[in-house]
Amino acid sequence: MLDQLIVGTFEQCFKKYFYDELVIGKLAHSEFKSGVQKGDEVDVIMPGTVAMFDYDGGDLPDAEVVTNSSTKVRIDKGRGFHFELKEIERKTIENAKDAGQKVNLVKEYSMDAVKQFASTVDQAYADLYTRAGHYVDGGEGKAITLSESNVKDLLAYMQAKFKRGDNKGHTNWIDGQMIAIVPPEFQFFLGKVEDYAYVESGHKKIEKGFVGKLAGWDIMVSNNVKGVTAEGKTTYYPLFGIKGKTLAGGVSSDLNTTPYKPEKNFNTRYKGYGLYGVGAPRADFLGSAKVEATMTIGQ
């Protein structure tokens, strides 16, 4: 009975807190899928767009259906996990005064697995930088060397690329929904820019990774931004896009968690796995840049 509670609560925690733990995944519309096997293709329904048209008077035409796009995502990746609860921890959960306290205790012991799984999915999203429809480098394939003087220019450049749109009323820029996901080195230079707006004190809920605003972008920092190291130098590929509309992901809702007790061990262990897949259906909603950074102090 206790094992059922622990397994059930762990999977509930996963579904409830997984999205909150994503950073790069904030660019994505991710859906939980049940009963999937590795290699399956699933449909992910992306948020819809609204059709606009010229109006010169008279009766309005019949309304068009809001266009939703469905994209195929292959569930081709998996992540296994295992954790152990000491017998005293199980007793603490078992003897909790009510169901709510039991759930909170299980959450406390299982959140690290949720965080690690979300980080793994974020890394998969980071690899999609190669699909970006808006891209800039330093010329001839070289990286842009970040500095106090050009970091805002890069954000403004990407803003202009997104605002251009398709000249049919469809802009790739939506005020208040634009996210730039950068490595910590990028944030170092942002801190030197005068009009960079840090996170407001007293903010009701700070999203994981959110550090401030500049040039219309909500800026989020992630260690999972793609980095490629060669000859002692690391090149990074920050991502730019529209919150929840740029990337697509499918994640198994079943974690296949099983309790077991090894021989000569009094503690109970739990093992399981989750499956996932990612895609970039809207290249025009995704931007990236090739950058490198050398941080120095007092120069």
What is each residue range found by the language model?
Residues 2-28, 35-38, 43-52, 72-76, ...:
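Sequence/fold signature of self-assembling virion shell proteins
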Residues 95-168, 288-299:
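Alpha-helical scaffold segments that mediate packing/assembly in large oligomeric complexes
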Residues 49-51, 57-71:
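Active-site-surrounding "flap" and adjacent substrate/cofactor-binding loops of secreted or lumenal enzymes
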Residues 40-42, 81-83, 107, 111, ...:
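N-terminal, well-ordered alpha-helical segments
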Residues 134-208:
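Extended, solvent-exposed, turn-rich assembly/linker loops in the middle of proteins
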Residues 69-99:
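Short acidic, glycine/tyrosine-flanked loop/strand segments centered on an H-E-D-like triad
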